[in-house]
């Protein structure tokens, strides 16, 4: 798609404003619905609602998704804690804004499902790493000066930040790669005038070979299994036990194995049964 076509298909400001508000509200509701499911690290939450700003990034571009995600996460965190939560605007807000701006930027000029996979991996890595590092260092250590976190060495803080990033990544990736495409294609079929032309006309079967999509699950799954084995049979497990008290070491080990198995199985299922996940009738509706 050339630049001229892109300009012609720009959404009006009024629609982008409405999209931003919708993204923020839906993301806040979705994030709050799982706000009380914690990570095995003791901080952070289970958040499959990231499919919402990912969807808005594809349909409406970087800014509605970024602003909507930032506002939505602040609302959800503040409602959970009962006040304007400093940990959210110090960590979650900048992480969500940067992450979903990157998502929208990557897929904006030319959408393909390959770029969608790239955007998903970049966003979930960068955004979660920003949130994890800022939440631990800026909020827990510098802002609150909580003894349990102040006592951690810098290598333990980095380890915890990376570990929290991994947790978020492996629990968000399946939802983004499976549910978001379904939402995109459903909206493209129901409201084609709102969806950019390149998004509307591309189909999963044409743009995303099943082996590519499967590898997007299989590779992280294999990595998680290998990390789990390293946790069990190498000094990594001893390091976790010496820096983080029970039951965190056991939960972390279980996290690596469970997420590895789930991602690996999903990758196999997608490869062997893709037509049952993305039905061809949706493709036909979009092409019409």
Residue spans of the language-model regions?
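Loop-helix junctions at membrane interfaces
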Residues: 1-288
């Amino acid at each position: 798609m050339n630049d001229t076509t892109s300009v012609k298909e720009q959404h009006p400001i009024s629609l982008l404003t409405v999209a931003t508000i919708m993204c923020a509200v839906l993301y806040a509701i979705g994030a709050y619905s799982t706000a009380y499911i914690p990570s095995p690290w003791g901080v952070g939450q289970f958040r499959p609602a990231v499919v919402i700003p990912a969807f808005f990034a594809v349909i409406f571009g970087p800014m509605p998704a970024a602003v909507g995600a930032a506002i939505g996460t602040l609302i959800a965190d503040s409602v959970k804690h009962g006040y304007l939560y400093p940990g959210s605007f110090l960590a979650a807000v900048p992480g969500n804004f940067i992450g979903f701006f990157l998502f929208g930027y990557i897929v904006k000029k030319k959408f393909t499902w390959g770029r969608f996979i790239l955007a998903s991996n970049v966003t979930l890595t960068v955004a979660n790493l920003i949130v994890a590092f800022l939440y631990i260092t800026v909020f827990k250590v510098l802002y609150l000066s909580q003894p349990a976190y102040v006592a951690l060495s810098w290598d333990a803080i980095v380890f915890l930040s990376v570990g929290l990033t991994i947790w978020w990544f492996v629990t968000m990736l399946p939802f983004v790669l499976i549910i978001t495409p379904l939402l995109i294609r459903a909206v493209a079929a129901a409201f084609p005038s709102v969806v950019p032309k390149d998004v509307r006309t591309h189909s999963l079967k044409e743009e995303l070979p099943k082996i590519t999509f499967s590898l997007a699950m299989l590779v992280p799954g294999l990595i998680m299994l290998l990390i789990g084995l390293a946790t069990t049979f190498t000094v990594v497990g001893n390091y976790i036990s010496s820096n983080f008290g029970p039951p965190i070491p056991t939960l972390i080990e279980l996290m690596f194995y469970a997420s590895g198995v789930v991602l690996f199985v999903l990758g196999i299922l997608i490869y062997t049964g893709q037509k049952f996940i993305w039905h061809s009738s949706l493709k036909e509706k979009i092409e019409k």
